Amino acid sequence: MPSHPLVRAFVDAVNAQDQQALWTVLAKDATVVDVGTERDPADWVERELFSSHARMEVVQESHDGLSVTARFHNDIWGDIDTAWEFSVSGPVIRGFVTGPG
């Protein structure tokens, strides 16, 4: 389980498939970069996390808890190892970068 409370809330929301919880922790104007390409956050979250039933199992994290590697599963990609780097400001995640881990 991630040690940083915002990252933990993000992972918990994904695993619970709780869109309201995710958008509580993720800034409305958050940036999402997936495999080097900036994506529309609302479209990406819906496609990659919710309509595809995503699950994340964090297997390693940085000392500050803002970078994690996770076993990720969704109905699009199946099981893949992923890396996530989160940027936070105050009570929200301002953005994240993800890709193969």
Feature map (PLM): residue ranges:
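Generic helix N-cap/helix-start motif at coil->alpha-helix transitions
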Residues: 2-3
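Short, well-ordered alpha-helical segments enriched in acidic and aromatic residues
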Residues: 6, 16-31
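Amphipathic alpha-helical repeat scaffolds
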Residues: 8-12
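Conserved short acidic donor-positioning loop in nucleotide-sugar-dependent glycosyltransferases
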Residues: 14-17, 36
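Surface-exposed, charged secondary-structure patches
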Residues: 42-89, 98
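Polar, enzyme-active/binding microenvironments
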Residues: 92
